Amino acid sequence: MNYVAQVLSNSFSVKDTKLVKRLLGSAGFYVDEWNDNGKECLCFYDNEDSAYLCDMNLVYYNGIPIVVTADYNDDEDIYQAIEEYAKVKEEDIDEDLIETQDFFIFLQTQLLDGEAVQVTEVGHEGLRYQSGCGVAITKNKYQWFDLKREMQKFVDENV
């Protein structure tokens, strides 16, 4: 049995909602968008075919963010997305123009002042083990959290 996980973010606001929404969709996430008193908000969640949080990479082609993928995805997915982009731009693909970046570093640059993103992933593999992790992102920093490690830290400090 394979690992199964569910991912959920809080609501947050970014500079370019359309771009972030497109990139999250390319990673297989559902994205909800709404207006809260004139402020565009969005959140994302899993559709069971999305990337695992720890593997999310943003693929750039010629400096333009194209697709979010994961290390375990077939390179063919990346090239297909870049081919589609190049076809629209009517240019040939130059492999030297492909770069990747941790998606959450990119997301940091998109956050509006005072905004933070909290994303959790909870999963299991045939209930043989369970896991929980998350990432908290602000404009200045992001940090990973592991549920098991955080619980053990609490126990160690309080027993």
Residue ranges and their predicted role:
Residues M1-D32:
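Short, extreme N-terminal segment that most often corresponds to the first beta-strand
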Residues D36-V159:
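Charged interaction segments
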